[in-house]
Amino acid sequence: YDGNNERALDGLNLKIRRGTKVAFMGGNGSGKSTFFLCLNGIRRPDTGKICIDGKAIEYTRKGLLEVRGRVGIVFQEPDDQLFSASVYEEISFGILNLGADEETARREVESVIKELEITPFQDRPAHALSGGQKKQVAIADILVMHPEVMILDEPAAALDPKHTKKVQQIVDHLTEKG
């Protein structure tokens, strides 16, 4: 992986049931983030394949859009994920990129902004936010697309206790919905 002769992942075979929460734990450099990036199609495995519902990921534009609509990832470092001029535009990008019409996107974005308490800074530049605010926006980026699988890489990093609890409540609610 990236010039290193060691395998980040080897012999991994995993089935996760819908409506469950799973935690992947391990030390730094153990392959957790690499695994997450493979699940979302951001990183392609050197050997083997990634299957979702028994279907291998297709590394074409269409195939990657499909998998990213189904599997959303919130990066460990929000700055690796945020790139739009304003928070509102940032949260709108993914759902519009997946083909939602502007009215549907507006409704969904406004709902997530309210749910995650982003309204006070929705018009600010994403790069000017605090670490906790950036994490909230990164979570909203994915939540607005209603993925079947939502991967949160170190979800509580840089969040205050109030927002850590809010993220946990959202994850619990999504898990209950299946």
Spell out what each predicted region is.
Residues 25-27:
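The feature captures the beta-strand-to-loop junction immediately N-terminal to the Walker
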Residues 40:
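Helix-to-loop junction immediately C-terminal to a conserved catalytic motif
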Residues 48-59, 67:
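Conserved ABC transporter NBD signature motif
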Residues 103-121:
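Conserved ABC ATPase "signature" region
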Residues 125-129, 133:
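Conserved ABC ATPase signature
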Residues 146:
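Conserved catalytic motifs of ABC-family nucleotide-binding domains
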Residues 150-153:
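Catalytic Walker B motif of ABC-type/P-loop ATPase nucleotide-binding domains
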